[in-house]
Each structure stands twice: as C-alpha cells, then as structure tokens.
Amino acid sequence: MWTTFIPDLLVAVFGAGLTVLIAFLTFRHQLKVTERVELNRLISDLNLRRVLHEITDPRLVHGAKDIDDFKHANLSVLDIREHTKRVGHHLRPNSPAQEPVSGLIKGCNRYLEAGMYEPEKYHFHPQELRSEVQACINKIAAGDDRIKPLDPGSSAY
C-alpha cells in the first residue's frame, strides 16, 4: 500500500489540477460566448431601430418638441442607451468590445443633448448618431468574425 502512495498522490493532484484547468477554460469560453450572443442581439436591435434609419432628405422641423415623432425618437435612443448599458455588464474584463460599447452610450448621450438644445434639427441628429453607431458596430465586428456587422436602421422598414 505505501509503495504506491506517492504515485497515487501525484495522479490525484494532477487530476485535480486538470479538473480545475478544464473548469476555468470552460468558464472563460462561456463568458466569451455570452458576450458574443449579447453583442449580436444588440446589433440586431440597432438594425431594426427606426430612429437609425437613413433619412434621405433631412430638414429643419420647427416646433419639433411638440411632435410625437421627436418624442418617439428620443425614447428610442434612451432605450438603445439602456440596452447598451445592459450589454456592457455582460462584457468580459478587458474585452475589445468595451470601447465601442462605451462609444455607443456616448453617442446616445450626445444625441439626447443635441436634441435638447436644437430640437428643430432632429432630422440631422439621428444621422450623426447613425454614423457613430455604424463605426462602433464595425469595431465590435472586427474583433470577432462570428459577430455580424448589420447596418443600423436598415431593417426598420
């Protein structure tokens, strides 16, 4: 019995170490898969947003604060910002997607601020946001070939 104690102990320690390593690698893989799923959902949501659909003839709209479309656009951007924040909670530490996801939130903040100060230009502000969103989507997709870079607002209609 004592003649095999050291080899048995080594095998047990090696097996335990291997188990911990496999569990750690599985955990890391699951984090990456969850991140990818959340990013794809976010991009799909952005693809369906009417507020991000390209406006071919933007114009000044006087009295925009009283128009329902202006209010709906702001609510949509608020929803985009909140959805993006929730996705940010699913990102891995040091994920390459953290910077573009933060950029999406900042773009939404800029849109909302611009709409507050220049509501009559609310046809122009979504186009600026759309450009920022497209750049962020491209950065996110560049880091992972399983993330589809859909155009924001292109499937809204």
Q: Which residues does each predicted region cover?
A:
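Amphipathic, membrane-active segments
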Residues: 24-82
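Alpha-helical rod/repeat scaffolding segments in eukaryotic adaptors/tethers
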Residues: 59-70, 91-94, 119-126
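Short, solvent-exposed, charged loop/turn and helix-capping segments
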Residues: 82-101
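Cytosol-/stroma-facing membrane-proximal "stalk/adaptor" domains immediately downstream
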Residues: 95-157
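Membrane-embedded hydrophobic alpha-helical segments
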Residues: 1-31
